[in-house]
Amino acid sequence: MIEIDGSFGEGGGQILRTSLTLSIITGKPFRIFNIRANRPNPGLQRQHLWAVKAMKMISNAETKGDEVGSKELIFVPHEIKGNTNIDMDVGTAGSVTLIIQTVLPAIINKNVRIRIKGGTDVPKSPTIDYIRLVYLEILRKIGIEAKLNLIKRGHYPEGGGEVIIENVNGNPSAFSLLELGKLTIIKGISHVSSLPAHIAERQMNSAREILSKLGVPIEIETDVRQGEVSKGSGIALAAIGEKSIIGADSLGERGKRAEIVGEEAARILINNLNTKASVDIHMSDMLMIFASLYGGEYIGAELTSHAYTNMEIIKKFLDIKIDVSGKRPFRFKAKIF
């Protein structure tokens, strides 16, 4: 059984999520202890338990310690169950997108359909539009297709969002994403839920003003939804090159002007573009598991402590050689033995 110190490195929920994903894919059980030991509210929280529950449902796993506040978890996976429908509610503050990241690599070609309720656009995790515009599009480039249906949006603290992820199929193989290539267009989605439509327009116009100096077409659409459970706004952007995609997002909050939201996302996008990386700081972390599973290399925007921690967990499950060089940007290469 693989032993994992949950306080290692950045010591957050990503250690658990990566472990769950790779445990199911490899069939290797693990024990994680000191879960989130250095955080203000240590131990498993509700959103972490839903990741455990989802993976348990998919693989009929045996578990011990899967309860709120637990600082230790044992997870013993069995065979992944195909042709499965799973419904889950990760709570008002729970991130739908973090669940998608955890589950998706493990259900490729398994005919699993998952309905997730919770927060689609919440702090400290990628927004659902980033997942649609960037994450899923880059996965398509490496041979993985997935259908995502955004039924309702959910913002902190009320939640109420709903997403279906299904038809996750493909034949991924070794890949090389070492440059963005010539920038061709910037796409985006500016949204509001149960707020005036002009907020989405102002976010969009603010981002467009800053991005116009890049000299490429800009296509930002607005998504205005009234009558949602939660109120909120945000914008996600994707700079599409001939070979890869760089993304960024920003969320509104009380007291934060719509123009600031749009400007923030645009400046994050430009900062990532200026690193000359092939993928942005979010995707630098998320692509690592796919590169490690199939053999791949890419240039990430920044080697964060989060990415470094992820790398060390991956090496516990997979017999691979990882070469990393640089910091901002960094080059990641995984070779499968």
Curated annotation (Swiss-Prot):
**Residues the entry annotates as binding ATP:** 101, 282-285
Task: Identify the InterPro entries for this entry.
Answer: RNA3'-term_phos_cycl_insert, RNA3'_phos_cyclase_dom, RNA3'_phos_cyclase_dom_sf, RNA3'_term_phos_cyc, RNA3'_term_phos_cyc_type_1, RNA3'_term_phos_cycl-like_CS, RNA3'P_cycl/enolpyr_Trfase_a/b, RPTC_insert
Residues at the catalytic site: 306
> In its UniProt record, which GO terms are filed under biological process?
RNA processing
Membrane-spanning parts: none
Primary location class:
cytoplasm
PROSITE patterns named among the record's database cross-references: RTC
User: What's one Pfam family the UniProt record gives for this protein?
Assistant: RTC
Q: What is the main EC category here?
A: ligase
Tell me which EC number(s) this protein carries.
6.5.1.4
**Keyword presence, Ligase:** yes
Statement: the UniProt record of this protein carries the keyword Ubl conjugation: no
Say what the protein does. Catalyzes the conversion of 3'-phosphate to a 2',3'-cyclic phosphodiester at the end of RNA. The mechanism of action of the enzyme occurs in 3 steps: (A) adenylation of the enzyme by ATP; (B) transfer of adenylate to an RNA-N3'P to produce RNA-N3'PP5'A; (C) and attack of the adjacent 2'-hydroxyl on the 3'-phosphorus in the diester linkage to produce the cyclic end product. The biological role of this enzyme is unknown but it is likely to function in some aspects of cellular RNA processing.
Please report which protein family the annotation says this sequence is part of.
Answer: Belongs to the RNA 3'-terminal cyclase family. Type 1 subfamily.
What this protein is called in its record is: RNA 3'-terminal phosphate cyclase
| Species the sequence originates in | Saccharolobus islandicus (strain Y.N.15.51 / Yellowstone #2)
Gene name linked to the record? rtcA
